[in-house]
A protein has these predicted regions:
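Helix-breaking motifs and short loop linkers at transmembrane-helix boundaries and internal kinks
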Residues: 51, 83, 104-110, 121, ...
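C-terminal transmembrane helical hairpin of 12-TM major facilitator-type secondary transporters
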Residues: 302-348
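Extracytoplasmic gate region of multi-pass secondary transporters
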Residues: 39-40, 235-290, 345, 349, ...
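A late C-terminal transmembrane helix in Major Facilitator Superfamily
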Residues: 353-391
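Conserved MFS/SLC helix-loop-helix module at the cytosolic interface between two early adjacent transmembrane helices
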Residues: 70-109
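Cytoplasmic helix-loop-helix junction between adjacent transmembrane helices
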Residues: 114-154
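Cytoplasmic membrane-interface "Motif A"-like loop-to-helix N-cap segments
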Residues: 81-92, 297-311
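Helix-loop-helix hairpin linking two adjacent transmembrane segments in secondary transporters
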Residues: 149-200
Length: 428
C-alpha cells in the first residue's frame, strides 16, 4: 500500500511521536555523558586517594574506552537484528549499575575492570540510538535531530563538572558515582515503555507522520534488517568517515577529559572555580552544535567545506589556549574553540545520517563510532604520557590535539559526498 496516497491526512499535531522518542534518546545520551565525564573531575582525587600518577589515571579513562569501543560494532549489529528499543534499554540499565559500582572501588585493578564493564554498557547504546533517529525522522529533519542529540556532547561535560565538583566538595568522589547510577534505571524503563522499533507500531504515531516517513523510507520505517555485514563493509565512505571521526575524537576526548585537570594544575584554579570555568566552553559548544545542525540541513552542499573550515578555526584557538599567559583569556579561547569544534561535529553527523541507509544505520554508525572510541583509548594515555614526560607541561598535549584535528580536516577533503537512498533492500 502507498501510504502517501492511501491514508487520509488529519490535522498535523504540534507534538509528534518522534519528538517524544528524541527526548528520551536525548536524556539517555545526557546521562551517558554525565556518567562518563564526572570521571574527568574526579580523576585528580581518585589519583590522590589511590596513589596514581597521570599515566595510571589515563589508564582508567582507557579502560572505559576499550569496553566502549569493543561494543560499538556488536551493539550496532544487535540493534539491526533485534531492534533499537531492546538494546538501548538493556545498555542503559547495565552501565547505570557499573556507574554505582565505580564509587565502591578502592584499588586500581578493580577500577579498571569496573570501568571496562561500564564501557560495554555504554558501547551498546550509540548505534541503537542513531538507528532509531534515522528510522523516526525524515531526511529533511535528521541534521537538526542529530544536532539536538549531540548537544549532550557539550552539556554533559558542562553539567558533569558542576555536579562532580559539588558532590566531591561535600561528600567525596565515591558518592558522585553511587548517586549517578540511579537515574539510568528510570530512563531505561522510559525507553522500553515509550518507544517502538517500527514507527508504525508506536501508539502515538499519526498518519501524517507515516506519510512523511514514506516519502523517503522505502521500507516504511522497518526497524530490523538482514543485510549481510560484508555488504555494509563494502561502502568506501564508511571507512573515510570512521577515519575522520577517529582523528576528530582524539581532539574531542583530549579536550573533554583533561580540561578540568589543566585548569586545576596549570592555571591554578580552585575546585569551585574549575566547576564553573570548565563548564563554560561546553555551553559554547552546545550553541555551536545547534547552529551546526541548522546549517547542516540548510546548507547540505557546503557541509564538507564548513567542516574543514570550522575544524581549522577550532585548531587555531586551541593553540591560543595554551600559548596565552592570561588564565582568563585561556578560558575565552577554549570557548571559541569549542564553538567551532562542535559546529564541525554537527556537520559530520549530518553527512553520515544522509549518506548511510537507515536499515543498516546500526552497524554502519557502530563502525564509524568504533573509530571514535579507539581514539578515546589512545587519547587519554598518550596525553597523560605527554604531560608526564614534559614535567607537567600541557603544551605537547595541546599540539597533539591540534595536529589530529587538522588531519581530520585534510581527510575530509578526500570524501566524495553523495546522497544515498534511505534504505538498502533486505535479502529474501
Amino acid at each position: 500500500m502507498n501510504l502517501q496516497t492511501s491514508l487520509p491526512l488529519g490535522k498535523p499535531k504540534l507534538w509528534k511521536a518522534r519528538y517524544t522518542v528524541l527526548t528520551l534518546i536525548w536524556l539517555a545520551w545526557l546521562l551517558s555523558f554525565l556518567d562518563r565525564m564526572v570521571m574527568s573531575v574526579s580523576l585528580p582525587y581518585i589519583g590522590k586517594d589511590l596513589n596514581l600518577d597521570t599515566t595510571q589515571q589515563g589508564l582508567i579513562i582507557s579502560a572505559f574506552f576499550i569496553g566502549y569501543a569493543a561494543f560499538q560494532i556488536p551493539g550496532g549489529m544487535l540493534a539491526d537484528k533485534f531492534g533499537s528499543r531492546k538494546i538501548m534499554a538493556i545498555g542503559i540499565a547495565w552501565w547505570s549499575i557499573f556507574t554505582s559500582l565505580t564509587g565502591a572501588v578502592l584499588a586500581l585493578p578493580l577500577m579498571l575492570i569496573v570501568r571496562f564493564f561500564f564501557g560495554i554498557g555504554e558501547g551498546c547504546f550509540p548505534s541503537a540510538s542513531w538507528k532509531m533517529i534515522s528510522t523516526y525522522f525524515p531526511s529533511k529533519e535528521r541534521g537538526r535531530a542529530t544536532a539536538i542529540q549531540s548537544t549532550v556532547n557539550t552539556l554533559g561535560p558542562a553539567l558533569a563538572v558542576v555536579v562532580a565538583a559539588s558532590i566531591i566538595g561535600a561528600f567525596g568522589w565515591h558518592m558522585v558515582f553511587i548517586v549517578l547510577g540511579i537515574p539510568g534505571l528510570f530512563i531505561a524503563a522510559g525507553i522500553w515503555l515509550f518507544t517502538r522499533d517500527n514507527p508504525k507500531d508506536h501508539p502515538a504515531i499519526t498518519q501524517q507522520d507515516l506519510v512523511e516517513l514514506a516519502s523517503d523510507n522505502q521500507d516504511g520505517g522497518q526497524g530490523k534488517s538482514n543485510i549481510a555485514f560484508k555488504d555494509v563493509l563494502k561502502m568506501p565512505v564508511l571507512w573515510q568517515m570512521a577515519c575522520i571521526w577517529f582523528l576528530f575524537d582524539i581532539t574531542f576526548w583530549g579536550f573533554s577529559t583533561w580540561l578540568p585537570s589543566y585548569l586545576i594544575t596549570v592555571r591554578e584554579f580552585s575546585l569551585a572555580k574549575t566547576g564553573v570555568m570548565a563548564a563554560i566552553p561546553f555551553l559554547f559548544g552546545a550553541g555551536g552544535t545547534l547552529l551546526g545542525g541548522y546549517c547542516s540541513d540548510k546548507l547540505k552542499p557546503q557541509r564538507k567545506t564548513l567542516y574543514v573550515l570550522t575544524s581549522v578555526i577550532a585548531a587555531g584557538f586551541l593553540y591560543l589556549t595554551f600559548s596565552v599567559s592570561s588564565a582568563d583569556m585561556a578560558v575565552v579561547y577554549q570557548c571559541v574553540s569549542a564553538l567551532f569544534m562542535f559546529f564541525a561535529m554537527a556537520m559530520f553527523w549530518g553527512i553520515l545520517m544522509d549518506t548511510i541507509p537507515s536499515n543498516i544505520m546500526g552497524r554502519a554508525s557502530g563502525i564509524v563510532n568504533f573509530g571514535g572510541q579507539m581514539a578515546g583509548v589512545i587519547s587519554a594515555p598518550v596525553i597523560g604520557w605527554l604531560i608526564q614526560s614534559s614535567d607537567g607541561s600541557y603544551n605537547s598535549a595541546f599540539i597533539f590535539m591540534i595536529a589530529t584535528l587538522l588531519c581530520s580536516a585534510v581527510v575530509t577533503l578526500t570524501v566524495k559526498i553523495s546522497h544515498s537512498v534511505n534504505t538498502l533492500p533486505n535479502k529474501a
